């Protein structure tokens, strides 16, 4: 029986808090389910909605000035959401509303509201790089890797981009400056800061509070546009979330990492923004070329990759004094694949203190083998490398999430061999190990190469799990 509680049954204060929030006397079930949320509910109830409305209006004026919506519409949307619980009787939906409202009242001001106040002066820290001098070299390197055969019958998933991306980019530029201890960028925009000729779409970010930030941003967009905004979590991408609009158009995505991971990511400071060190990004690019899909992207738009590659090559030339003379020494390191067990053995003794690296293509198998080794010193760098690393008895153990290209039966293609070497070098950079000689040899091994056709490739590791999402309009959280 769903009776209304009377004030003699429950503590007056808790009952009053819930009653004020719901705008009605709670049922017995509502009271018992919501009483542990009383503290959060009280914060929501006393939250100054007028100040919040003012902050959203200021965000709109600064970053979304071209969006056709009035101040009164924004206010109505905000007040409507903060009274939504009064018309909601489903306990699950009430919990969702409380959780999302709690995020807004406790974090919005510090995360997005702060972007409306006067910013610190920008510390100009740009260096003039001669990217043009690297364009021919980059083109030569990429041309030798442009070996993917495009299957015209293959149906490619479309990546629809929202018209709001330019507004969000403008906001993100300021956000990266204000929150540069917890948020850094990589990808095309970060390279654009070095070379203004780089074209970029959305801004790629790593941060330590991704979920909170994306919820706040989703609500800002909802209050300004009136659109239903959905946050999605993809199971095969670690700690990844994306914001899309109601038409499935991509707005922004983000990877979340721990603070201890953030602390070790190599980064440089440009115009008050931290970007992932382009040396690290170059290694990641070389690693990603082992992925057959990335080679297909290269085939479709080689000039886009050329601009990025030339920028990063010039950066490493200038920063590390790399001489491009074709001297490759022992690069790429020897790689032998066991296709049945899906493990690649890389001979590393010429460069590192560990004699070899066992690269697993199945993450669960690696995890099981590490347990069998009874070793507890593995390093997990989350989405920064998509892998753990362990050095035990002079052997490195790690996981490689991309495909392995083969140039012949049982023979690792040199593109993948370089990708595996780059994967090991990422570890060296993250742990402040020696990498510069190896980096020089690796880059020189990419010069003056002939195209080698792809014979076949291994399949990527299948990741279990389900898609998660937050649907603001329908008051649903599934994770």
Curated annotation (Swiss-Prot):
Example GO BP: mRNA processing
Top class in the EC scheme: transferase
Molecular function terms, GO-annotated: ATP binding; metal ion binding; poly(A) RNA polymerase activity
Name the UniProt record assigns to this protein: Poly(A) polymerase catalytic subunit
Family assignment from sequence similarity: Belongs to the poxviridae poly(A) polymerase catalytic subunit family.
The keyword DNA repair is assigned to this record: no
Keywords from the UniProt entry: ATP-binding, Calcium, Early protein, Metal-binding, mRNA processing, Nucleotide-binding, Transcription, Transferase
Function: Polymerase that creates the 3'-poly(A) tail of mRNA's.
SUPFAM superfamilies: Poly(A) polymerase catalytic subunit-like
Encoding gene per record: OPG063
Gene3D superfamilies assigned to the protein according to its UniProt record, in alphabetical order: Poxvirus poly(A) polymerase, N domain, Poxvirus poly(A) polymerase, nucleotidyltransferase domain
Binding site for Ca(2+) 2: 202, 204, 253
Transmembrane helix among keywords: no
Binding site for Ca(2+) 1: 202, 204
InterPro entries: PolyA_pol_cat_Poxvir (IPR004976), PolyA_pol_cat_sf (IPR037265), PolyA_pol_nucTrfase_Poxvir (IPR024231), PolyA_pol_nucTrfase_sf_Poxvir (IPR038419), Poxvirus_polyA_pol_cat_C (IPR024397), Poxvirus_polyA_pol_cat_N (IPR024398), Poxvirus_polyA_pol_cat_N_sf (IPR038337)
Upregulating conditions: Expressed in the early phase of the viral replicative cycle.
EC number: 2.7.7.19
UniProt catalytic activity: RNA(n) + ATP = RNA(n)-3'-adenine ribonucleotide + diphosphate
Assembly information from the UniProt record: Heterodimer of a large (catalytic) subunit and a small (regulatory) subunit.
Highest taxon of source: Viruses
Pfam family membership, one: Pox_polyA_pol_C
Species, as recorded: Vaccinia virus (strain Ankara)
Positions annotated as active site in the UniProt record: 202, 204
């Amino acid at each position: 029986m769903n009776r209304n509680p009377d004030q003699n049954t429950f503590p007056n204060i808790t009952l009053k808090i819930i009653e004020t929030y719901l705008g009605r006397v709670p049922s017995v079930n509502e009271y018992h389910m919501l009483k542990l949320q009383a503290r959060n509910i009280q914060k929501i109830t006393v939250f100054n909605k007028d100040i919040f409305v003012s902050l959203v209006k200021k965000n709109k004026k600064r970053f979304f000035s071209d969006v056709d919506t009035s101040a009164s519409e924004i206010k109505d949307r905000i007040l409507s959401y903060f009274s939504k619980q009064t018309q909601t009787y489903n306990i699950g939906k009430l919990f969702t509303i409380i959780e999302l409202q709690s995020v807004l009242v406790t974090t919005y001001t510090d995360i997005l509201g702060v972007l409306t106040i006067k910013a610190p002066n920008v510390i100009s820290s740009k260096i003039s790089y001669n990217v043009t001098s690297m364009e021919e070299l980059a083109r030569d390197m990429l041309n030798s890797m442009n070996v993917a055969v495009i299957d015209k019958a293959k149906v490619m998933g479309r990546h629809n981009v929202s018209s709001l991306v330019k507004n969000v980019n403008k906001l993100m530029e300021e956000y990266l400056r204000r929150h540069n201890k917890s948020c850094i960028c990589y990808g095309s925009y970060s390279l654009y800061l070095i070379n203004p000729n780089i074209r970029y779409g959305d801004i790629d970010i790593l941060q330590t509070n991704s979920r909170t930030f994306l919820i706040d941003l989703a609500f800002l967009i909802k209050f300004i546009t009136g659109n239903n905004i959905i946050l999605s979590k993809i199971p095969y991408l670690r700690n990844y979330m994306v914001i899309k609009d109601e038409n499935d158009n991509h707005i922004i995505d983000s990877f979340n990492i721990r603070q201890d991971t953030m602390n070790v990511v190599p980064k440089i400071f440009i115009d008050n923004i931290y970007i992932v060190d382009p040396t690290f990004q170059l290694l990641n690019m070389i690693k990603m070329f082992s992925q057959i899909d990335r080679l297909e992207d290269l085939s479709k738009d080689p000039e886009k990759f050329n601009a990025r590659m030339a920028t990063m090559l010039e950066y490493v030339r200038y920063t590390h004094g790399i001489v491009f003379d074709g001297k490759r020494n022992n690069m790429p390191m020897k790689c032998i694949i066991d296709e049945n067990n899906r493990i690649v053995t890389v001979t590393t003794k010429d460069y590192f203190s560990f004699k070899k690296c066992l690269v697993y293509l199945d993450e669960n198998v690696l995890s099981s083998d590490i347990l069998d080794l009874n070793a507890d010193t593995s390093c997990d760098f989350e989405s920064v490398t998509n892998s753990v690393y362990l050095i035990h008895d002079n052997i490195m153990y790690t996981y490689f999430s991309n495909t392995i290209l083969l140039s012949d039966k049982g023979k690792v293609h040199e593109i993948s061999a370089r990708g595996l070497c780059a994967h090991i070098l990422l570890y060296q950079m993250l742990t402040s190990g020696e990498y510069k000689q190896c980096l020089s040899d690796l880059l020189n091994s990419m010069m003056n190469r002939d195209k080698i056709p792809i014979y076949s490739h291994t399949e990527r590791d299948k990741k279990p799990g389900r898609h998660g999402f937050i649907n603001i309009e329908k008051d649903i959280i599934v994770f």
